[in-house]
Each structure stands twice: as structure tokens, then as C-alpha cells.
Amino acid sequence: MTVPRVRSYVPGLDEILFGGIPERSVVLLSGGPGTGKSILGKQFLYNGLKRGDAGVFVALEEHPVAVRRSFRHFGWDIAQYEREGKFAIVDAFTGGVGTAAQRERYIVKQVDDVHELSDVLRQAIRDTGARRVVIDSVSTLYLTKPAVARGTIMTLKRVIAGLGCTAFFVSQVSVGERGFGGPGVEHAVDGIIRLDLDEFDGRLYRSIIVWKMRDTKHSMVRHPMEIKDGGIEIMWDKYIKITGSSVRIEPLPKEEAEAMRKAVEDVEKQPAPKKIEIEEE
């Protein structure tokens, strides 16, 4: 059975996912500060916009003005898509306070009320016809109330998947923490992608690993990655080998690299996806 997929078009990411993200999945982007989680989420949205997939960005930790500026930093012009009604920012940061915030169309007044957030998000998705959603950072919603984490994630997931969207939830973890955002969160999402920034012999190494992804095969090794002027690039045909306190970047076995490359080619040959059936009411 062929699994419908959403291509990220992030260099190297579709390869390590053997073709892309299964449609309607909610994927946790987990990692410490400075690892590139927010960049990856925005790159996923912008790559979709360029190819006709409308998108919604939920800002929980940044002012909408700062969000737009961070897109522009990489040359990602979202202004035209906002004007055309194909992209929207849900302001769950300001609570509607301030003159700049008052110009926003989608505002969550009670930023810790997940039901209000769900209602505003639902409206933004319907208005734009969004296929892609990014929430940055979902950790903000339950940081002081870990007991409600799973319920929060499931509430948002029902709205997003029910409206036919595929989503990235950015999740903050402390430096050196091995988890991904808590057991309630980790089991509720469909996929987990971990981004890391580690020091070896005085040098920082960026890496990415797919920890889980339902309905698809995925790479089982840690891949090196870089943040360049145009966004994130993953060295999908290489992996990081750690021995003691040293690190080496090695090429993947040829058969593994070939299988990843072929999987992406096969997805590219598939016919354009049909209109997604909306189930959520």
C-alpha cells in the first residue's frame, strides 16, 4: 500500500524519511536551544508555500513581527502569501496587547487556553486552506502543567489532522536532556525528529536523527546537518560516528543511500495528491 506523503523539500530530510512525511502526521521537532528547530519548521512551511501548499504558523514564543523577520532572514518572502490569503500567523504570544499585535487577524487572547487556541487555529486553517501547520513552541502550553501535556497535544492533533494538515510541533528540551518533551507528548505524536548541537574537542557539530515516524521506514542513524544562508541542509548520505570523545563523519553504506534516493524518486513519480477529505467538525 502506498502511503500518501507530504514532501518537506528540505535538502536531505525527505531522503532520511524515505520519501517524505506521511500525510496528516503530527511530528515533534525536539532539541535544545540553537539546534535549528524553528528554522526547520519555517523552512517546511515556506517550501510548501512555493509549491502551492498554504500554511499556518502558530507563534507562542515570538512576537509576530519577529516571526516575519526571521522568515526574511533566510530570504523567505512570506508577505505575498499573506496578502493572497495563503499564509497566516496565529498570534498566541501577545494576547492582543500592543499596536502591532492589534493589526493581527488571528489572535489568541488567553494564551494558556488550548481550547481558544484550537478555535483560532481551526479558523486560520479553514480561511487559508492550509495543508501545513507549525506550532512554535508547543512546550509553552504545558511547561508549568506537565500533567495536561498529552491532552493538549491530542486536542491540537484532532483539529490539525481532521482538517487534513501535516504539522511540526517544536518542542524545547534542556541542553544534555535525552528526552523529547515528556512521555505524554512523545507517545501522542506520530513522529519525533531530534536536532542536536554537541561539542567535541572544542568544536560544535550539528546533527539530526529520526527517532520515530509512523507509517514509514526511516533512517536509523544520526546525520550531520548545517544551517546555511538558504536554511537547513542535511547530509543524508553521511552519518556521524562517535567514538569516546572523538567524532567522525562517515559515508553511509551504498545500498542504504541508494534505497533512500530511490524512495524519493518513487514519490516524485506519484500523481499529484487528490483533494484531502476533511473529517473534523
Swiss-Prot record:
<feature type="domain" description="KaiC">
    <location>
        <begin position="4"/>
        <end position="248"/>
    </location>
</feature>
<dbReference type="InterPro" id="IPR010624">
    <property type="entry name" value="KaiC_dom"/>
</dbReference>
<dbReference type="GO" id="GO:0005524">
    <property type="term" value="F:ATP binding"/>
</dbReference>
<dbReference type="InterPro" id="IPR022475">
    <property type="entry name" value="UPF0273_KaiC-like"/>
</dbReference>
<dbReference type="InterPro" id="IPR014774">
    <property type="entry name" value="KaiC-like_dom"/>
</dbReference>
<dbReference type="Pfam" id="PF06745">
    <property type="entry name" value="ATPase"/>
</dbReference>
<protein>
    <recommendedName>
        <fullName>UPF0273 protein PAE3143</fullName>
    </recommendedName>
</protein>
<comment type="similarity">
    <text>Belongs to the UPF0273 family.</text>
</comment>
<dbReference type="InterPro" id="IPR027417">
    <property type="entry name" value="P-loop_NTPase"/>
</dbReference>
<feature type="binding site">
    <location>
        <begin position="31"/>
        <end position="38"/>
    </location>
    <ligand>
        <name>ATP</name>
    </ligand>
</feature>
<keyword id="KW-0067">ATP-binding</keyword>
<keyword id="KW-0547">Nucleotide-binding</keyword>
